[in-house]
Amino acid sequence: MPQASTFGSHSLEAHPLHIQPAVHIKLSKEERSHYREQYDSLKYISNYVSVFDQALSDNIDSRIRKENEALLKKYYESRKPFTFTSFRQGSVISSSDSSTGFTERTKTYCFLNDFVSNCVNEVDPYTLKMTVRNRNTALNMENLDDERKSKDDIYDFEDNTDDECNAKCHGAFHYSSERLEILRSRSTISYFKYYKKLLTVDLRDSDVLKRHNLWMPMITRRFRFLLVSSSKPEDVRLTTPIPTFSESDLDIFKNKTCPLFINGTDCVPRSYDTFSGSSVIASIFSEYKLPSLSYHCSVELNDQLFIVGGLMACHRYDEEAPDLKDFYVDGIKNLPPPLIPELINNPSMIPNPHLYCFSLTSSRLTRPDISGYIPPPLVCTQGCKLTERHIFLYGGFEIKSETQVDDKGRYFIRKRAFLNNTGYILDTVTFNFSKIELVAPPYQFAIYNNFSPRFGHMQASISNSNNNVSNENTTTSAKGRRSISPYRQGNGDHKIDDLVGSPGSTDYLEDDAIPPVTNPRSTDSLSSKHCSTATHICSSVNTILIFGGYSQTGDDKYEAMNDMWKINIPVVSRGKRNYYKFADTVTATKIPIIDDPELWPSRRAFSACCVPDYFTKDVEPIETRLLRNLKNDFSIDLEIRPGNKPSQPLFPNIPHSRKEKKSGRDSMHISNSNNSTSEDTSSKSTRNTTSSPPTSPKHTPPLNPSKKCASIGRTIAFHGGSDGYDVCSDMWWFDFDSETWTKIDLYAKTQEESDGLVPINLCMVGHSMTTVGHKVVLIGGLRQGDVDRIYRDETLPEEVISGVPLGSGVINVVDLNTQCLQGCKLIRNDGDTKESVIMDPHVGTPHQVLAVAGTIELVKGTMTLIGGVVAGREDISSLYLRGAVLQFILPSMNLAN
């Protein structure tokens, strides 16, 4: 049966929301001088392709490009003019509800859905059945021409009246070599067997088939040199000459190669994988193709990633990218790093209005229908876990556009940013949004008592672990423990050990300090009267902390802040299955700022933060824990039973061999004492191994040998950020219970072991941060040199220095025990330490790749990267979209060592 035409089915004239052509205007030269031209659609470095995607001819790809360009023009024609006064004074909130009728948001969604509709792989069931049935034929084919001829007889395109197009389709419609390589791969055998069972259902219900569509990752052949097999390691850099390919054939498989089906999952781009062998480009199951997102927000909850906001590309593949020669943009000015103007102001990057859910356990992507007070498509919004069911979103800005068309058909687009000051709560069960207004309490002597709208801020949720709810009519008797850091003079020379107290000190609260708490008699919703007194005993509701970010002081003028706010969202009522109804207005409590640069972080935004698990576990070797568990759970009875001969030593000549029998009680006593001695020795050796390596007296950080565990999730760590174009390098830890900051210095080794550890300035902004055991993992971001080149138009220095710049790797690891940067050594010349390093041989050479605008989540040892852009540091202006999901499995062997 002929295959229905999947693409080119959108009739713009018959569109239900067809916009009348814009009135042509004439712009003066002065007005046109504010608009920039020469924008190009960004290309992909990694992307997804469906197993059942068809091999298209160059004419069909040309039709898709023209259609995307027409849709893009219609989308910008629908952008109404805006006034600054109506938005600058107040917050940008969504007034739309599920009951709202035909609104401006509906028009926007309609056009954006047309872009996304090209991302839906609408598979014809009969063609699907034919493809699976003929797979064995494709496997056994040796001649590519025979394969093409057989496919020409099976497939045909409808709704194609162009004779030339018909001729091209008849002669050029075929499977590419990469396509046949995928079909012949043994990796797809199990999937095709699985899919054959789905074909037993009613073929009229094609939605069942769509949900099981497999999308495979691929790397464009232009960057094929990045793919290095673990069996054949190669030392390649991004400076390797890039091969050129002719673009005569625009088949979506022509200039692409799939790493999953070449050398297996161990074949990954080393530019992403500094620690080779720890990253995987994951395949996904989805009805929709995952769009390439940038500056979006992703929050992990119950092993699922919820992705909202950001910008997405309006084209699926490079061959479908629209021509932007008719678009002129007056973009957002003075964008601070890491907001790249070429990405934010690009007309092919449109706001993402959808919510995507990605299951980390099943690798399944869904796009649920959302309702309620839906937030506008926000850029750089921040989200965090509120309860086991709810996610709290705040901040970011909305990009509003207005368009004027001249008599030559040129589109003059004006873009401006409007900050959001409304909080949104997402119910992950019903996918319903609710909004919350954040207000600041009035302070009599406060200078800045206004809770300003912001973006690029630090936002984290802290578990209220001390607020435990007991059984009915039973008071809590457990003692609440909290870790209180000693008040230190802020000289910046602090060890991680200083953040915790001595094991001998009992930092407990008295029993009377915690009031008795009782459970409600019913799990149904409570009255507001009861919930007002039980706001903080509805445990599971986390406290939100917000620090810094950029506020808008004028038209395209932004100022960094360093204020810190604590938000406790009141609960009006609660019900079953962790359902909560929250109040509409929340009062944010400001934490007083200490005017001391050594006790309080400076103004900054886009810093990396996380809630580390370093203090939630004993930092002791696994051998010590195993020995303790054996001692507590097992015992050996050495008492000799009557009638049995005593056992003889295997090697009696060894001095420590057993010579005589001892009673069971004495043996147990000796064994216990030996175990106790062994444990004490292990504890001492543990403290010795966690101390810093031999360092020079000048640069030796203070060492506190005592450790203890703090409360779970009560400490926040953050690093870097920037104030304008000045990138920060310091690391800070915030203790939630004492509400104090501690500055932590970072160190690195040098080529001379006698120098010990020397302090370093790891300047980074726009990166992500997480912890794996006692290792801090920093991923992506911009260095100070990158910021100077992108925003200040500085060039690379002509002098050639050995090594690579500090922080150039995609992954940077810091050991918390020694506060030392791992996997590299500083280069010193004439006693001066330059910001350049050499890598250890066992780690491998890092590739000079820049990665920014993506999100990273760590779940059960797997770090998932979604979206963003990458670029080679030699040609930092050439940005490439990351369309495939990249996963790091941590800790890898190199990271663990």
From Swiss-Prot:
Major localisation: cytoplasm
Superkingdom classification of source: Eukaryota
Compartments, record wording: Cytoplasm
UniProt Kelch repeat ranges: 304-352, 390-438, 543-589, 715-761
Biased composition (Pro residues): 694-704
InterPro entries reported in the protein's UniProt record: Kelch-typ_b-propeller (IPR015915)
Keywords tagged on the record: Cytoplasm, Kelch repeat, Phosphoprotein, Repeat
Chain intervals with Low complexity compositional bias: 464-477, 671-693
GO biological process, one term: negative regulation of Ras protein signal transduction
Region (Disordered): 464-496, 638-706
Record note on quaternary structure: G proteins are composed of 3 units, alpha, beta and gamma. GPB1 interacts with the alpha subunit GPA2.
Name of the protein this chain belongs to: Guanine nucleotide-binding protein subunit beta 1
Native source organism of the sequence: Saccharomyces cerevisiae (strain ATCC 204508 / S288c)
High-level lineage: Eukaryota, Fungi, Dikarya, Ascomycota, Saccharomycotina
Gene that specifies this protein: GPB1
